[in-house]
Amino acid sequence: MTSSTDSVPVITFADSPFRLHQPFPPAGDQPAAIELLTEGIGDGLMYQTLLGVTGSGKTYTMANVIARCGRPALVLAPNKTLAAQLYAEFREFFPENAVEYFVSYYDYYQPEAYVPSRDLFIEKDSSINEHIEQMRLSATKSLMERRDVVIVATVSCIYGIGDPVDYHAMILHLREGERIAHRDLVQRLVAMQYTRSDIDFRRGTFRVRGDVIDVFPAENAELAVRIEMFDDEVEHLTLFDPLTGHLKQKLVRFTVYPSSHYVTPRATVLKAIEAIKDELRDRSAWFQTSGKLVEAQRIEQRTRFDLEMLNEMGFCKGIENYSRHLSGRGQGEPPPTLIDYLPSDALLFVDESHVSIPQVGGMYKGDRSRKENLVGYGFRLPSALDNRPLKFEEFERLMPQTIFVSATPSTYEAEHQGQVVEQVVRPTGLIDPAIDVRPATTQVDDLLSEAKRRIAVGERVLVTTLTKRMAEDLTDYLAENGIRVRYLHSDIDTVERVEIIRDLRLGKFDVLVGINLLREGLDIPEVSLVAILDADKEGFLRSERSLIQTIGRAARHINGRAILYADVVTRSMRAAIDETERRRVKQIAFNQANGIVPKTVSKRIKDIIDGVYGGDVERDGRSVAEPPPEYFSMNEKTVAKSIRKLEKEMQEHARNLEFEKAAAARDELFRLRQRTFGADQHGTP
């Protein structure tokens, strides 16, 4: 069924709670892809792959599939930046449904660690982004309350959070006329980790004014609830604006969700305390028997302090290290994660699956190696090893019906596919670039002449090399021959990288040389030529997937072309050339059959740079990095002031979801602390 809201058609489907705002009808390969994926889900296929080329509208296809199936969906993205983009797009498609954002809520995180070689213990240090914490709590609330939910998440979703059973047991249901003692209500709020604050009323707090209790729900950023009591009875429930105090809506019932995912009923905490004491007794005895008296004293002192806090307050610093006891799990059992909150019929979309799947697989071992040191030297009990991300095989067992989304699916997707659905034809009519193979022996001189030809008509060139040395030498050679050129490599941080791309688009230089130009964000419409040097050197940077990804960088220009410099055609080259040619044939045939004339993508320069680059800064030469500030001459007072300023900037950028800017402020903070205090602030080497 189709209706219209503000001139945007709204599409609904039978038995689906989703209302899809459809600014344009599906085009190109989208209609067939949507139909096939929806059929596959209906037929019960556990795994499907959407092979969608760059610029083919994969997010739009996902939104259509979700709307047709009418089931809650989890969309897994490889990083925060891409997750934020997907979140914004899904909110445009589903403004009337629950689109949620679940990523790590740390602006800054330094994990607890011990470096035996230096006898250095590094305390856990972190800065939590309150806005993202609220969004995480909102995500789990939506899953418990409704079916029309889309959650965009990063790999953070495989890390342990509170057990959904305990979380659900702590929910407070309020109804008009319900009998509950004023004191009991306050105690329930404290048990749910709400803080009483009669002066600073903010998210996750409550205040008491006579018989009136105001609660600012942890998962809500805009509205609070007023509970008016009379003689141990809930007389009125009202939503109000916590800033102005204006009443918004009278309620008959209201549900208050816990202030944290880690809340635990009192009975469970007391039971866990006894289990922790038993483990402490065994561990301390083992250390003493082994002659490790320092470790025995250390584990006793640290754990006894935590036990006292748990007994008195119901939580302690580092409570996640006792999650096995608190959730009643056995040794080695997987922790509860966001996936446990999903209903059994949920859908999982793994975006950029060739990156996301290996990322999920790599989390467990890195976390384990750090914790083994903490356990071995008496800083933590062995049960802390079970506070961990999911192992890959555990993640696999929990995966609901899954759709992998990628332009270059990897081996895992090939081994787990009920069907592969192609989305090769772009709605814009653009076709993949033509490919030339030329001899590697004359690659530099040939590249120089090709670059001059492109520059003469106002187009840009990307060049990818195998080594950093080659990139630097080639940059120098091209510069000596009058080409405006810069290079990009791993030593350049996020913000500098974005600045370089901005300058390339603005025409401040014409050729960009790099080693691995596959990373998200390098879709530059002005680029008409991609040159791959030494394309016949088999390896990670010249694999079939890497070549296809690199060739695709020229796919947004009507004159797009890729040149592979090689003396022999390798298996990877042949596969990449054949795949690109297959796509071109299909795209050209579709355009001819439908009378579509391709045109270069028009994208405002600020679209790539928004939220990252602030203001025009004059930069000359081939280096865009500003010299780092000099801190050696600062006195103690100035250093402290600078640290506070940088921390404030970092938190402000993270609050605005400007993760690149937040990362730049964080790195500057690291440098300042390291130069001032002579300590490595990054944690373990």
Curated annotation (Swiss-Prot):
Motif interval(s): Beta-hairpin: 105-128
GO molecular function: ATP binding; ATP hydrolysis activity; DNA binding; excinuclease ABC activity
Entry protein name: UvrABC system protein B
Keywords: ATP-binding, Cytoplasm, DNA damage, DNA excision, DNA repair, Excision nuclease, Nucleotide-binding, SOS response
Native species: Aromatoleum aromaticum (strain DSM 19018 / LMG 30748 / EbN1)
Occurrences of domain Helicase ATP-binding (ranges): 39-420
One of the record's GO cellular component terms: cytoplasm
Main localization category: cytoplasm
Binding residues for ATP: G52, V53, T54, G55, S56, G57, K58, T59
UniProt record, GO biological process: nucleotide-excision repair; SOS response
Alphabetized InterPro entries for the sequence: Helicase/UvrB_N (IPR006935), Helicase_ATP-bd (IPR014001), Helicase_C-like (IPR001650), P-loop_NTPase (IPR027417), UVR_dom (IPR001943), UVR_dom_sf (IPR036876), UvrB (IPR004807), UvrB_inter (IPR041471)
Chain's role: The UvrABC repair system catalyzes the recognition and processing of DNA lesions. A damage recognition complex composed of 2 UvrA and 2 UvrB subunits scans DNA for abnormalities. Upon binding of the UvrA(2)B(2) complex to a putative damaged site, the DNA wraps around one UvrB monomer. DNA wrap is dependent on ATP binding by UvrB and probably causes local melting of the DNA helix, facilitating insertion of UvrB beta-hairpin between the DNA strands. Then UvrB probes one DNA strand for the presence of a lesion.
Coiled coil: none
Location of the protein in the cell: Cytoplasm
Domain notes: The beta-hairpin motif is involved in DNA binding.
Domain Helicase C-terminal stretches: 443-596
Domain UVR positions: 640-675
Subunit structure and binding partners: Forms a heterotetramer with UvrA during the search for lesions. Interacts with UvrC in an incision complex.
Family as reported in the entry's similarity comment: Belongs to the UvrB family.
